[in-house]
């Protein structure tokens, strides 16, 4: 048997034996609070569409308007003919809103994170990351020529001990951690990095749009401005793509040397057109964030007495189970009661910390939270 085939079959068999096999579910209802799968309807508590913009008709119309003007695709790299007025307007809207000189667009958050670290870092640099950072950041750190260190999750003292004034450091954290829903102590990290003359980068995929007075995210809430800010459009924006916010020189550097940017087809101009509308909607429609605050309170009131409850100030609500098989059982029992929640297992989270990753969106209702609470109580009682 060829080595590749043997290796593939062995890896798949091991994954199944450990109870960690994953499958793809085909849904028919789009990204909404109610989803349809295999002929059944569920209340969807697994969507990252935090502000409920993905199916907002104003945003759908903006997509349609963009399509009528620009067609379906960009047709080229941004460095050739793929950068339209729609892309330029989106970059301008982002920089004005978030207070940076440049915004460089990418097709995904994964791509943006990889591009940033692989382009910026050299062998003489030291990269210091929170140990719970996203896989895209960790992989990029391992692939980069820099020396990578990891500090204990949100541990400022440990971070400080890893910094020195002699080395060229880049410190990277998420603003909101995707599996735990907790926030990084950004003000403290900014103070420590500044004292060591280090650069600071924040991946705010899950904070942008949701936190801060204008929806400016974790950094707006903490009143900090890192040298580098990564925002993604696949969560609160209701679409996909990402941008790196930075100063003029760094923006020019990424434009010239970031291979993910130079050698990729630009995102569709109609998408950029719609994203520009989303930027305005996020800032102007604060009622969406207010609705999330209300739902957070309803979630706490309904579930705080259950073993596994974890309180967060964000839309991400980890419900801790422990073992992978138990997490799958609870998720399955919830689905039998019309609740779609996803069991998160290793290697996404550390062994022994499997959980349900519950997410709230502005399209949910208090009544749906009550239904979730009852389904969880019933599922846990059956273990």
Curated annotation (Swiss-Prot):
Matches recorded under SUPFAM superfamilies: PLP-dependent transferases (SSF53383)
Residues with the N6-(pyridoxal phosphate)lysine modification: 235
Catalytic reaction equation(s): 6-carboxyhexanoyl-[ACP] + L-alanine + H(+) = (8S)-8-amino-7-oxononanoate + holo-[ACP] + CO2
Function of the molecule: Catalyzes the decarboxylative condensation of pimeloyl-[acyl-carrier protein] and L-alanine to produce 8-amino-7-oxononanoate (AON), [acyl-carrier protein], and carbon dioxide.
GO molecular function: 8-amino-7-oxononanoate synthase activity; pyridoxal phosphate binding
EC number from the UniProt entry: 2.3.1.47
Keywords from the UniProt entry: Biotin biosynthesis, Pyridoxal phosphate, Transferase
Binding site for pyridoxal 5'-phosphate: 109-110, 178, 206, 232
Catalytic class of the enzyme: transferase
Pfam hit, one: Aminotran_1_2
Pathway membership, UniProt: Cofactor biosynthesis; biotin biosynthesis
HAMAP family from the UniProt entry: BioF_aminotrans_2
One GO BP annotation of this record: biotin biosynthetic process
Subunit: Homodimer.
Cofactor(s) this protein cannot do without: pyridoxal 5'-phosphate
Protein source organism: Vibrio campbellii (strain ATCC BAA-1116)
PROSITE patterns linked: AA_TRANSFER_CLASS_2
InterPro entries: Aminotrans_II_pyridoxalP_BS, Aminotransferase_I/II_large, AON_synthase_class-II, AONS_Archaea/Proteobacteria, AONS_Proteobacteria, PyrdxlP-dep_Trfase, PyrdxlP-dep_Trfase_major, PyrdxlP-dep_Trfase_small
Name of the featured protein: 8-amino-7-oxononanoate synthase
Binding site for substrate: 22, 134, 348
Family: Belongs to the class-II pyridoxal-phosphate-dependent aminotransferase family. BioF subfamily.
């Amino acid at each position: 048997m060829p080595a590749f085939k043997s290796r593939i079959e062995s890896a798949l068999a091991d994954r199944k034996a450990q109870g960690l096999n994953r499958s793809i579910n085909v849904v028919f209802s789009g990204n909404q609070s109610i989803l349809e799968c295999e002929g059944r309807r569920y209340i969807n508590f697994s969507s990252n569409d935090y502000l409920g913009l993905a199916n907002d008709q104003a945003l759908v119309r903006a997509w349609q308007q963009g399509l009528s003007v620009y067609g379906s695709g960009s047709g080229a790299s941004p460095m050739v003919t793929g950068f339209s007025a729609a892309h330029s307007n989106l970059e301008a809207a982002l920089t004005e809103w978030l207070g940076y000189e440049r915004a460089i667009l990418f097709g995904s958050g994964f791509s943006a994170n990889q591009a940033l670290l692989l382009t910026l870092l050299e062998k003489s640099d030291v990269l210091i990351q929170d140990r719970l950072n996203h896989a895209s950041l960790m992989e990029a750190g391992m692939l980069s020529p820099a020396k990578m260190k990891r500090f204990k999750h949100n541990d400022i003292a440990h971070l400080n001990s890893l910094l020195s004034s002699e080395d060229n450091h880049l410190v990277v954290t998420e603003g909101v951690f995707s599996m735990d829903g907790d926030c990084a102590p950004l003000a403290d990290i900014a103070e420590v990095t500044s004292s060591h003359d280090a650069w600071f980068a924040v991946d705010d995929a899950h904070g942008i749009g949701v936190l801060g007075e204008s929806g400016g995210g974790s950094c707006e809430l903490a009143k900090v401005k890192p040298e580098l800010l990564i925002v993604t459009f696949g969560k609160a924006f209701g679409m996909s793509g990402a941008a790196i916010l930075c100063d003029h020189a760094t923006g020019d550097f990424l434009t010239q040397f970031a291979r993910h940017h130079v050698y990729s087809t630009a995102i569709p101009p109609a998408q950029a057109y719609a994203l520009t509308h989303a930027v305005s909607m996020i800032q102007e429609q604060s009622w969406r964030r207010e609705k999330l605050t209300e739902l957070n309170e309803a979630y706490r009131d309904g579930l705080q007495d259950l073993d596994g409850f974890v309180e967060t100030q964000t839309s991400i609500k980890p419900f801790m189970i422990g073992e992978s098989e138990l997490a799958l059982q609870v998720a399955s029992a919830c689905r039998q009661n019309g609740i779609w929640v996803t069991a998160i297992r290793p290697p996404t989270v550390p062994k022994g910390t499997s959980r349900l990753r519950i997410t709230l969106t502005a399209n949910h209702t208090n009544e749906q939270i009550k239904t979730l609470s009852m389904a969880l109580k019933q599922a846990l009682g059956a273990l």
